[in-house]
Amino acid sequence: MLTKEQIARRIAKEVKDGYYVNLGIGIPTLVANFVRNDIEVEFQSENGVLGMGPFPFEGEEDPDLINAGKQTITALKGASFFDSATSFAMIRGQHVDLTILGAMEVAQNGDIANWKIPGKMVKGMGGAMDLVASADNIIVAMMHTNKAGDSKLLKECSLPLTGVNCVKKVVTNLAVLSVENNSFKLLERAPGVSIEEIQAATEGDLLVTGEIPEMQF
């Protein structure tokens, strides 16, 4: 079973040379710490940063440099800063190659719910709806089950939707799965996790074909 950092490390393998990548709040913000040094990647934050680096070391934080989740960040050489209108013009104009988001639920058809739990106070959906409506490549980073032990990979989302039929891949603490043919296709297992354990934790239809390798980092 993976930690949040290991989930982020696995997702970092999906980041390709030359990509412009938007990182959502939560586990996705960790991805910048694990990208290979031999590729060039531009991380974008919807609050107006292009060229985010990894988190700063303790004692080196700059309170004026934050991401959309209000966490302190570093800026790489050549980074730029701009207003939200420009930031969302980049997003809505489909200039982002990869979007990595957290989620409360993902459905087997690619629907995502990640902004509201009815009855709980929320600040709003933020930029997630713009991201899922504009991006062609969306990866979700999340735990496989919620705190009550219920699956977050469902036949249909029960929470208010952020986007419809948009998620391409999900990386959890148990597995890597793609969304294909109205089902979750199992691609990789977390080290030491069996297919049966993944099946038991997945409410949606799980497609398993051939040998399923363990994740490599």
Report the location of each language-model feature.
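Conserved phosphate- and dinucleotide-binding cores of soluble alpha/beta proteins
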Residues: 3-6, 57-217
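N-terminal active-site beta-alpha-beta segment that forms phosphate/nucleotide-binding
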Residues: 1-76
